[in-house]
């Protein structure tokens, strides 16, 4: 077979047209040391801060230290197979985690990989773990309540959607219990919840998952778990990963709640990483940027306006505001709230719920100290009826605390002082609440009305809780229409006050407790 010159030239032209001489440039470095989850890489010239670095064995590192001639990176995973002399490559990407509705009801690790044995997460959406918080122009003031269902919080330290409210106290005094109750109370409200467990035992996290499933709260909750057995790197990035998952809902005009349990352990993990990276230590051996560690995380919790949501969704969602409410938890040592990390987070957040060991041991649970606890913006978001009825509760407790210390020295007290002490004791008893027994707005208002109007004054202290239980049972059976009306409107006027009075007096007359 003989080809003509024209056919040969045609074939050559075709081959030239199809020839693809693409050159892929990769920045390559050499690992010069690996120890304690930290790799030092020489020769990565184009790496950026926070970039993912491809390491041997399908493992990635996070570039944290950019030196003149080397890069310090923390390994996100197992590093025992990595050795000196191995190659490392830039990826040009920063760390992203999966986001979206498909994550609801799932337990994932800090990188978004499922760890609950229910298969892969069915989402293609991802989001960077580090994002700039919305600016002032895109924010809206906090004016919608986020009901926790806990009397002492909703009446005295109200939380609004888009607020950052710190829960602070020693270990084992009910910080997580408050957060879990708040998540359970969001059932049916449309608020999506993210619970970030940092440095906790796997058994503790499994117990929380079981509790949320038992009370039907898991279907609106994502759990991000960086257990005590996970590396410091995963404990450090877990809150940022959880925040990105929450921002997915915020940016689409929905409401979300995120619990960081707890940021003390994240600060410990970051301190460990920083010391291993040879960063200069400061107060309590923390690095200089530990304030920025928490501020850049908590500033991402916000209420955003309609324009922000419309711009983010390219006009798909209009006329809706979004919010991400944060409940960071800080563990103190022997009640010392003046330590480095507690003071940092107190200054960043919009208020704090302070739990005290002495109150917990005396039987007051939740062990909230109303004197040290404050909500800086939640008052504007409080439901009308709770705001009206809760004012008297705070006043009664303030007077009680003042007189309680004085009464220990005074032998004969006048009638008015004795009445204030009696009411204070009964209000304190009323604020006791068992875990997993959150209240609706109407039932809470009923309890506060009874206390505010002196219906508890002639009861024994031991009768207060049984009376409240009987009052709620009566209201839910005989006066369910009133309860439904209050829950729907949350208004407080003379008509509602009269209806509450009828219910309380009916219960007092029955004496069925």
From Swiss-Prot:
The yes or no answer to whether the keyword rRNA processing is present is no
- The EC class name is translocase
Looking at the keywords, is Translocase present? yes
Q: Where does ATP bind?
A: 169-176
Per the record, the similarity remark reads: Belongs to the ATPase alpha/beta chains family.
So what does this one do? Produces ATP from ADP in the presence of a proton gradient across the membrane. The alpha chain is a regulatory subunit.
Query: What protein name does the entry list?
Result: ATP synthase subunit alpha
């Amino acid at each position: 077979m003989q080809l003509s010159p024209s056919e040969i030239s045609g074939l050559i032209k075709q081959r030239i047209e199809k020839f693809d001489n693409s050159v892929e440039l990769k920045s390559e470095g050499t690992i010069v040391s690996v120890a304690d989850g930290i790799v030092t890489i020489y020769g990565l010239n184009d790496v950026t801060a926070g970039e993912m670095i491809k390491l041997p064995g399908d493992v990635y590192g996070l570039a944290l230290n950019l030196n003149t001639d080397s890069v310090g990176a923390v390994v996100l995973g197992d590093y025992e197979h990595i050795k000196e002399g191995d190659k490392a490559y830039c990826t040009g990407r920063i760390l992203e985690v999966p986001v979206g509705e498909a994550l609801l009801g799932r337990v994932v690790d800090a990188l978004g990989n499922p760890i609950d044995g229910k298969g892969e997460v069915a989402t293609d959406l991802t989001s960077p773990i580090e994002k700039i918080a919305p600016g002032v122009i895109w924010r809206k003031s906090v004016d919608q309540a986020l009901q926790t269902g806990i009397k002492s919080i909703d009446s005295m330290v109200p939380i609004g959607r888009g607020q950052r409210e710190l829960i602070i106290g020693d270990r084992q005094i009910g910080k997580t219990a408050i957060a879990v109750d708040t998540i359970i109370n969001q059932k049916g409200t449309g608020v999506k919840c993210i619970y970030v467990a940092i440095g906790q035992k796997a058994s503790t996290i499994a117990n929380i998952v079981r509790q949320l499933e038992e009370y039907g709260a898991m279907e609106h909750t994502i759990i991000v778990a960086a257990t005590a057995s996970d590396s410091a790197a995963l404990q450090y990035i877990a809150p940022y990963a959880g925040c990105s998952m929450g921002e997915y809902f915020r940016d689409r005009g929905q409401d979300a709640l995120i619990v960081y349990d707890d940021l003390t352990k994240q600060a410990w993990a970051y301190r460990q990483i920083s010391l291993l990276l040879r960063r200069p230590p400061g107060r309590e051996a923390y690095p200089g940027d530990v304030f920025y560690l928490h501020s850049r995380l908590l500033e991402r919790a916000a209420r955003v306006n309609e324009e922000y949501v419309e711009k983010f969704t390219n006009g798909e969602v209009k006329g809706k505001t979004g919010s991400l409410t944060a409940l960071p938890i800080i563990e103190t040592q022997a009640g010392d709230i003046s330590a480095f990390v507690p003071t940092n987070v107190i200054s960043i957040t919009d208020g704090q719920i302070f739990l005290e060991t002495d109150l917990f041991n005396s039987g007051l649970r939740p062990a909230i100290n109303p004197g040290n606890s404050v909500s800086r913006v939640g008052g504007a978001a409080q439901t009308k009826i709770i705001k009206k009825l809760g004012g008297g509760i705070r006043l009664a407790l303030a007077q009680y605390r003042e007189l309680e210390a004085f009464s220990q020295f005074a032998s004969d007290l006048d009638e008015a002082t004795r009445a204030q002490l009696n009411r204070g004791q009964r209000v304190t008893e009323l604020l006791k609440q068992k875990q997993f027994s959150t209240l609706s707005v109407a039932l809470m208002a009923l309890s506060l009305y009874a206390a505010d109007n002196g219906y508890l004054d002639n009861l024994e202290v031991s009768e207060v809780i049984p009376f409240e239980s009987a009052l709620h049972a009566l209201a839910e059976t005989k006066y369910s229409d009133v309860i439904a009306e209050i829950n729907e409107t949350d208004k407080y006027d003379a008509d509602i006050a009269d209806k509450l009075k009828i219910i309380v007096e009916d219960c007092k007359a029955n004496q069925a407790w």
